[in-house]
């Protein structure tokens, strides 16, 4: 979006603050329905960041796929779980929880140090020069594919990882 500097900064700070609160709600709330709604809030805030970064296609895909489908599916699945199962477990911290916390702290820091130093266009198969030459020769669907493979490669891969984690979580819940 082409917003003035202060408004853009306020929206980024607001989105980040709401994103942090929603993430804490997903992890800390004991009621799984409230956690699922917090996850929906997190996904909407991520979509807001994509709008602010002028990647409207990824933002709309985030809203439609993750907020509209995945989060509704999670809420639907959680509503079938017996509510008494969640209130009986009073063992709050285990060794696995500590390992998971350590992993959840180290992965974002390693990503924050790795991603800015990586030249993403050197990794990708298509380059900017090929994209400019082919723009007049291809249709809109192929242009979307080229944009997903060049400009929006990292957000597209991160969204696919989020989908993978949600599918693993759904399978784990279904087995229990």
From Swiss-Prot:
Please report a single Pfam family linked to this protein.
Oxidored_q3
Membrane topology for this entry? Answer: Multi-pass membrane protein
The reaction(s) this protein catalyses: a plastoquinone + NADH + (n+1) H(+)(in) = a plastoquinol + NAD(+) + n H(+)(out); a plastoquinone + NADPH + (n+1) H(+)(in) = a plastoquinol + NADP(+) + n H(+)(out)
- Keyword annotations for this protein? Chloroplast, Membrane, NAD, NADP, Plastid, Plastoquinone, Quinone, Thylakoid, Translocase, Transmembrane, Transmembrane helix, Transport
This enzyme's EC code(s): 7.1.1.-
On subunit structure and binding partners, the annotation says:
NDH is composed of at least 16 different subunits, 5 of which are encoded in the nucleus.
This protein is called what? NAD(P)H-quinone oxidoreductase subunit 6, chloroplastic
What organism does this protein naturally occur in?
A: Sorghum bicolor
**Highest lineage ranks of the organism?**
Eukaryota, Viridiplantae, Streptophyta, Embryophyta, Tracheophyta
